[in-house]
Amino acid sequence: MGGNLSSELKSTKYRKREIVDLRKMNIDKLPPTIGALQCKELLLSENDLITIPEEIGKLSKVEIIDFAKNRINYIPPEIGSLATLKQLFLSNNKLFYTPITPNIGALKNLTRLDLSSNQLDDLPVEISNCEALEYLDISDNQLQSFPLEFGKLYNLQVFNCSKNSLKSLPSEISGWVKLEELNVSNNQLAFLPNQICLLGLLSTLNVGFNKLQQLPEELSSMVSLTNLDLKVNPPLQYVPQLSNLRQLKILSIRNLQITHLPLGLGLLSELIELDIRDNPQLKEIPYDIATLINLQKLDLFGNNMRIVPREVGNLINLQTLDLRQNKLTIDNIPSEIGKLVNLKKLLLSNNLLIALPPEIASMKALKEFEASNNQLQAIPTEIGELSGLTKINLSGNKLTSIPASFGNLSELQICDLKSNEIAELPTTLDGLKSCTKIDLSHNMLTELPWEFGDLIGLTILDVGHNPLTIPPNPIVMKGTESIIQWLKKNEKEGRKGKVSGLGIQQDNEK
């Protein structure tokens, strides 16, 4: 498109525009006339560009340039002439082919630089001369380190170096006195420098998916933190006390090797999300969790918990409670769980439950309920009081029947009851008018209720691996629509007891 674009850029239509938007236009080459533009914003992302012409340096008014998602492998030194440039986006290109020009350091007004996803293994030290830089994204590259001189970027507010191969962070980061967000997740870090605790304005610290063996004891001095992500650092056995982090809203200590939760957790009254999943050495929750009254999400998946403390009933704002893959029995789930009246998602799968607590009937806000892969023998009648439920999964249990009250779940959309021992279904299930998917496979059903013929909204009805005679197997093999139509068509005769599965099969074959 180079030739046509050249003439267009010469025209008044583009030349005097403040914003030149050429995104997603399959452009593979920029003409020299690009330098004649008087725009403040030049948007060229999602094209097929390989090079940037040297005339780019003539854009005397440009403040924003977006070259993201091209195939650019070379930045001309003339880019250093763009004295007015404030934001430069070069993510998702191929800049590893040629070293990035050191002239990039001449961009004294640059506040935002994005070099992410370029397979870079080196960066020019001259970036440290971009003294106005507030946002620097060098994530998703192949960096083992970055220049120590980056510590001179005193105005930096956001630094993203995630998805690289960093083995350490330099102590020079203490110069980032204005830093608010630091993301160094998905690297090879074993330790953090103590100087990280000097970043007094830091609100978000993400060091997840590393190889951290130890954390600075002074972590609790970072009182501005609102989001602390330590997840998936398998060697980490100890998290220092966090009692001073009174503004913390999100804490993830997932997949560590801790045997107890950090001291002072109960003092973090602003916490909204607490992720403690996949800590198999952790066997109990401290009772002071009761003070976390603002908590909305509590993830305890994959621990060795045998008891839920009564104090969990104080978490009245909780919306999601994940207790999957623990060792809970019905005797160790307190009745106080019924106080969680704002709970929208309750997950109890992969435990040792033989029954469900009847107190779940109090959870009127519940939308999603899972208790699959337990040893449940019955569903409490009270389940029918959860009229707002949209998804239920009780697969992989020992259920032999479904209570008639199940038909009251008028908002239910997905119902998974596979791999049980259900031999009969209640006729009230025609009340599941909102249901789009029902899985009853791998049970002991011989007949489906005729009322299923009224569930016209069903797109998936799986009744495979049941000894069904009504409907007959040839109908079942044809799928959901055929099953629903067959039940509807034969309902009248079937209710009179004049229809057998074999007889209908023969009628359909004629």
Swiss-Prot record:
Extent of the LRR repeats: 14-34, 35-59, 60-82, 84-106, 107-130, 132-152, 153-176, 177-200, 202-222, 224-245, 246-270, 272-292, 293-315, 316-340, 341-363, 365-386, 387-408, 410-432, 433-458, 460-478
InterPro entries: Leu-rich_rpt, Leu-rich_rpt_4, Leu-rich_rpt_typical-subtyp, LRR_dom_sf, LRR_domain-containing, LRR_R13L4/SHOC2-like
SMART domains the UniProt entry points to: LRR_BAC, LRR_SD22, LRR_TYP
One Gene Ontology CC term in the entry: cytoplasm
Tagged with keyword Ribonucleoprotein: no
Consequences of knocking out this gene: Loss of function mutant is defective in the regulation of F-actin organization.
Transmembrane segments: none
UniProt KW Cytoplasm keyword: yes
Major localization listed first in the record, in broad terms: cytoplasm
Keywords from the named record: Cytoplasm, Leucine-rich repeat, Repeat
Annotated GO biological process: aggregation involved in sorocarp development; cell-cell adhesion; cell-substrate adhesion; chemotaxis to cAMP; chemotaxis to folate; culmination involved in sorocarp development; establishment or maintenance of cell polarity; intracellular signal transduction
Chain segments annotated as coiled-coil in the UniProt record: none
PROSITE patterns (alphabetical): LRR
Localization of this protein: Cytoplasm
Function: Involved in cytoskeleton remodeling, which is needed for normal chemotactic aggregation and efficient cell sorting during multicellular morphogenesis.
Name by which UniProt lists this protein: Leucine-rich repeat protein lrrA
